[in-house]
C-alpha cells in the first residue's frame, strides 16, 4: 500500500497498514515541527544571535561555532520546509510518482544545503577523482565519519557527477521530513538496524538496486554508523569472539570502523555488472556528534578532501568478498591517516 501524498514505500516494499499508520503519525509531528522551528529561529534571531555569540566569546572560541551552527540550523529548517512544500505541490499536480522531478528536487536541496554549510560554517569541499567515476550502474562504498556524510555524497553524486543516487539509509533518518518524503519517492531503502529478520533487510537492499542503468549509483556506508574510537574498539572486541583472525587484521584501523559485509554483498548480488567506486574523505574527523562539531569548528576551518577511486570487480576473483572489503578499508584508513599526519 502507498500513500502517494506522503511518498511511496521504502525501496523494499515493506509498507503495510501498520507502517502507513506509523508514517502518518511521524509526519504529522515532524513536518509542522520543522516548519515552526524555521519560523521560530528566524523571529528569535535578535535573541539567540547575541546570546550564542556571548557563549562563544566567553569560551574563547574564535571560530564562533555556536553562532555558525545555529545559522546553519535556520538554513536547514527553511530548506527542509521548502522541500516538503515542493513535494506536496508535486503530489497536488499528480507528479508524486515522477522519479525525474524528485531527483531534481533532491539535487536542488543538496546543493542549497552544501551552500549553506559553506556560508555559515566555512566548510570547503575539494573533490579529486570525479572524472574517475565509471559509467553506471555504479556501486559506491562510502566512508562514514560525520553527520554530514549523506548530504555531501548526495551533492557529490547528484549535483557534481550528474548521477541518480539510490541510498541504503538507516530508518532513523525518517525523522528528517524531506528525506522521509522525497527519499521514499525515489529508489532508496531505509534499513531497520534493529530488525530480527536480516534476510528481509538484505532483500530490501537488493530490490532497491535492481533495474539500475547507466546514470544510476547505489550508495552504501559499509561501516553502518559514524566512526569514532569508542565504537571502533567496541566492534573489534565483539569481533574477536566471532572471528579472531579478522579482528586481528582490522586492528590496524586507526580512523575507520570495520566494514559490514552483508549489505555490500547484497548490492553486488543485485548489480553483478556494476562498477565499484570507493569514496573517502578527510576533514570531518570528530564531527560524529553535535558537540564534536562545535569542538572541531572552534579549532580550525573545515576543509573536506574527497577522493574517488575505482575498484575493479575482477579483483574479487578467487577471494571472499569480506577479505576484499577488509583490504580496501585498510587501504583507505592508511590514506586517511597519511593525509591527517601531513595536514
Language-model segments: residues:
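Catalytic core of membrane glycerolipid acyltransferases/transacylases, capturing the structured
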Residues: 87-109, 119, 134, 138-197
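Generic preference for hydrophobic
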Residues: 127, 167, 306-308
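Accessory terminal regions of nucleic-acid processing enzymes
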Residues: 315-343
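Membrane-anchoring hydrophobic helices of lipid-metabolizing enzymes
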Residues: 5-138, 152
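Membrane-helix interface segments
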Residues: 61-66, 162-163, 234
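A structural micro-motif
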Residues: 123, 163-165, 274
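A cross-family acyltransferase "interaction/gating" segment
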Residues: 171-188, 213-319
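A Trp-anchored, charged/polar loop motif used as the substrate-binding/catalytic surface
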Residues: 198-210
Amino acid at each position: 500500500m502507498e500513500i502517494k501524498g506522503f511518498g511511496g514505500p521504502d525501496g523494499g516494499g515493506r509498507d503495510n497498514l501498520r507502517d502507513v499508520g506509523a508514517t502518518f503519525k511521524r509526519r504529522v509531528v515532524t513536518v509542522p515541527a520543522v516548519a515552526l522551528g524555521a519560523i521560530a529561529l528566524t523571529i528569535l534571531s535578535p535573541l539567540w544571535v547575541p546570546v550564542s555569540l556571548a557563549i562563544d566569546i566567553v569560551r574563547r572560541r574564535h571560530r564562533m561555532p555556536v553562532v555558525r551552527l545555529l545559522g546553519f540550523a535556520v538554513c536547514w529548517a527553511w530548506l527542509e520546509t521548502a522541500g516538503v512544500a515542493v513535494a506536496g505541490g508535486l503530489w497536488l499536480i499528480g507528479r508524486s510518482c515522477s522519479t525525474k522531478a524528485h531527483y531534481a528536487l533532491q539535487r536542488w536541496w543538496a546543493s542549497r544545503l552544501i551552500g549553506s554549510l559553506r556560508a555559515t560554517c566555512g566548510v570547503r569541499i575539494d573533490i579529486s577523482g570525479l572524472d574517475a567515476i565509471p559509467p553506471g550502474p555504479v556501486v559506491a562504498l562510502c566512508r562514514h565519519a560525520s553527520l554530514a556524510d549523506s548530504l555531501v555524497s548526495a551533492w557529490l553524486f547528484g549535483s557534481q557527477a550528474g548521477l541518480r543516487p539510490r541510498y541504503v539509509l538507516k530508518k532513523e533518518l525518517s525523522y528528517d521530513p524531506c528525506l522521509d518524503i522525497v527519499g521514499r519517492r525515489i529508489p532508496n531503502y531505509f534499513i531497520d538496524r534493529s530488525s530480527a529478520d536480516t534476510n528481509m533487510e538484505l532483500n530490501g537492499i537488493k530490490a532497491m538496486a535492481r533495474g539500475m542503468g547507466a546514470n544510476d549509483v547505489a550508495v552504501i556506508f559499509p561501516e553502518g554508523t559514524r566512526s569514532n574510537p569508542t565504537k571502533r574498539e567496541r566492534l573489534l572486541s565483539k569481533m574477536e569472539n566471532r572471528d579472531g583472525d579478522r579482528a586481528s587484521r582490522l586492528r590496524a584501523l586507526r580512523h575507520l570502523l570495520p566494514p559490514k559485509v552483508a549489505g555490500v554483498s547484497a548490492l553486488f548480488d543485485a548489480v553483478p555488472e556494476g562498477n565499484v567506486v570507493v569514496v573517502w574523505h578527510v576533514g570531518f574527523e570528530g564531527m560524529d556528534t553535535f558537540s564534536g562539531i562545535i569542538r572541531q569548528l572552534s579549532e580550525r576551518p573545515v576543509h573536506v578532501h574527497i577522493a574517488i577511486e575505482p575498484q575493479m570487480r575482477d579483483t574479487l576473483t578467487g577471494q571472499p568478498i569480506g577479505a576484499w572489503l577488509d583490504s580496501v578499508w585498510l587501504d583507505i584508513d592508511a590514506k586517511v591517516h597519511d593525509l591527517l599526519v601531513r595536514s
